[in-house]
């Protein structure tokens, strides 16, 4: 019997599906963190494949800051309804009561209270012992050294010096009461892999990833798309329509657009072939201080 050769993308797909099934079988109360971006869309697609024709054996969790793009919220609700997924949405009530605002309080405090603390609140509230995330090792150097099974203590903290070996796709999921893991099925994927797989599998994505004329202003070296009226213009700032798209999505005041004419998936794939910069270069939360992502992850960030 001839052995079937798997393409690079099919090998990645098989590995991710294996990881998702392992976690679903091994842990009592898993959840999939759904941030609405391209990686979340791929991860959800893989999870649906893993359990087809059945439904997902775990819910989706969106930790909402109240500052996502409107198109992201519309896409989130439409996707959950179309696929019949259980969608949990959590917003830090203390942060809401405090009126936490990225413009007033800055990116570091906004991220810590609305995202990190919000995530920990949700994990504690529902008692999840495993949480799938869409992080990839090629995104950022602290993520590059993180294991696929990323262990967290009872305070959801990550210790990069206390990670378990992962040999030959064998994962040790033993945890003590109160501990949990974050699981990254897309760890070995690259940004180019993600886009090629989206094109190959015809996966639906937020339209913000495709270039279009959008209202933007330049601030702190970033092209900020103005998504609503919660912004005060600084002296000399002018909102202009420019042809832009997003390589990564987050809170709109903290996520920069890139000038681009790529309006189709093949054009994006071609653009990525010659790109020499990280997709996270325009995420303000990654610029807070040196090693800011690792510090956030140590405190319980995604």
Curated annotation (Swiss-Prot):
Q: Which residues form a coiled coil?
A: none
* Broad class of enzyme this protein falls into: transferase
- Highest taxon listed in the record's lineage: Bacteria
Q: Answer whether the UniProt record assigns the keyword Nucleotide-binding to this protein.
A: yes
Reported EC number(s) for this entry are 2.7.7.4
| Keywords, comma-separated and alphabetical | ATP-binding, Nucleotide-binding, Nucleotidyltransferase, Transferase
GO biological process, any: hydrogen sulfide biosynthetic process
Q: Which GO terms describe its molecular function?
A: ATP binding; sulfate adenylyltransferase (ATP) activity
Q: What does the record give as its pathway? A: Sulfur metabolism; hydrogen sulfide biosynthesis; sulfite from sulfate: step 1/3
Show the Pfam families listed in the entry. Answer: PAPS_reduct
Q: Which reaction does it catalyse?
A: sulfate + ATP + H(+) = adenosine 5'-phosphosulfate + diphosphate
Q: What does this protein do?
A: With CysN forms the ATP sulfurylase (ATPS) that catalyzes the adenylation of sulfate producing adenosine 5'-phosphosulfate (APS) and diphosphate, the first enzymatic step in sulfur assimilation pathway. APS synthesis involves the formation of a high-energy phosphoric-sulfuric acid anhydride bond driven by GTP hydrolysis by CysN coupled to ATP hydrolysis by CysD.
User: Which family is annotated?
Assistant: Belongs to the PAPS reductase family. CysD subfamily.
- Subunit (UniProt): Heterodimer composed of CysD, the smaller subunit, and CysN.
- Any idea what this protein is called? Sulfate adenylyltransferase subunit 2
> From what organism does this protein derive?
Shigella boydii serotype 18 (strain CDC 3083-94 / BS512)
Per the UniProt record, the lineage of the source organism begins with: Bacteria, Pseudomonadati, Pseudomonadota, Gammaproteobacteria, Enterobacterales
């Amino acid at each position: 019997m001839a052995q079937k050769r798997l393409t690079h993308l099919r090998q990645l797909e098989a590995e991710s599906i294996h990881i998702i099934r392992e976690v679903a079988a091994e842990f009592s109360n898993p959840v999939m963190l759904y941030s609405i971006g391209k990686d979340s869309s791929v991860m959800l697609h893989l999870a649906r494949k893993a359990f087809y024709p059945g439904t997902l054996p775990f819910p989706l969790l969106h930790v909402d800051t109240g500052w996502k793009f409107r198109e992201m919220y519309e896409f989130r609700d439409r996707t959950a309804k179309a696929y019949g997924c259980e969608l949990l949405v959590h917003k830090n009530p203390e942060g809401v009561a405090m009126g936490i605002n990225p413009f007033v309080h800055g990116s570091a405090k906004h991220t810590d209270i609305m995202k990190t603390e919000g995530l920990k609140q949700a994990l504690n509230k529902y008692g999840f012992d495993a949480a799938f995330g869409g992080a990839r090792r090629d995104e950022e150097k602290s993520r590059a050294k993180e294991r696929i099974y990323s262990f967290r203590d009872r305070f959801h903290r990550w210790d990069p010096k206390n990670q378990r070996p992962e040999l030959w796709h064998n994962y040790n999921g033993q945890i003590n009461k109160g501990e949990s893991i974050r699981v990254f099925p897309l760890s070995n994927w690259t940004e180019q892999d993600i886009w090629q797989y989206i094109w190959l599998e015809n996966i639906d994505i937020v339209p913000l990833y495709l270039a279009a004329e959008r209202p933007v202003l330049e601030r702190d070296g970033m092209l900020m798309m103005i998504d609503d009226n919660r912004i005060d213009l600084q002296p000399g700032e002018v909102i202009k329509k420019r042809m832009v798209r997003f390589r990564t999505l987050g809170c709109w005041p903290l996520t920069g657009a890139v000038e681009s004419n790529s309006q189709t998936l093949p054009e994006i794939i071609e653009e990525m072939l010659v790109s020499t910069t990280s997709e996270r270069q325009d995420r303000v939360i990654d610029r807070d201080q040196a090693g800011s992502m690792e510090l956030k992850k140590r405190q319980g960030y995604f």
